[in-house]
Amino acid sequence: MKLLVLCIFAMMATLAMSRRWNFVTPREVNKAFEVALKVQIIAGFDRTLVKWLRAHGRSLSHVQKKALYFVNRRYMQTHWANYMLWVNKKIDALGRTAVVADYTRLGAEIGRRIDMDYFYNFLKGRNMIPKYLPYMEEINRMRSADIPIRYRGK
């Protein structure tokens, strides 16, 4: 029982720290900048997935492969606020007004640096690839630039 309580407190402290001590107000980003980020992040994730499928995807069905493409898009949507914190820090460090090429470069860096191979191996190894549903098809059919995101800040 003591161990359970200790684990719960540790989890609460971890969540509190991941949300920061103070509220960071979200900064709205120009649509062109947002599109540049999304396109490059998804391109990087999809490039990683194609390489991974060549090496490990022989046993996966076509539907499971499509579900992994959805995982890429959902991962980007889920972590968008964290990406924006990092992007805002990098843009502020430039010391000049940002242009689309800056956001394109940062989006490509995010897509390249995040180790999605780990997630694909985790999902495949534990047979946790999600069942492909109609809403997944809708998001997969969208262009990278049109994938909806919500930035509420952290």
UniProtKB/Swiss-Prot annotation:
Q: Partners and quaternary state? A: Homodimer.
Q: Which GO terms describe its biological process?
A: single fertilization
Give yes or no: UniProt keyword Signal.
yes
Protein name (Swiss-Prot/TrEMBL):
Egg-lysin
Which SUPFAM superfamilies does the record associate with it?
Answer: Fertilization protein
Q: In which tissues is it expressed?
A: Sperm.
Task: Tell me yes or no: is Signal among this UniProt entry's keywords.
Answer: yes
Q: Which UniProt keywords apply?
A: Fertilization, Signal
Please, which domain of life does this record's source organism belong to? Eukaryota
Task: Give the function comment from the record.
Answer: Dissolves the egg vitelline layer nonenzymatically during fertilization. It creates a hole of about 3 mu-m in diameter through which the sperm pass.
**Family annotation (Gene3D superfamilies):** Fertilization protein
Q: Which GO terms describe its cellular component?
A: acrosomal lumen
Leader sequence residues: 1-18
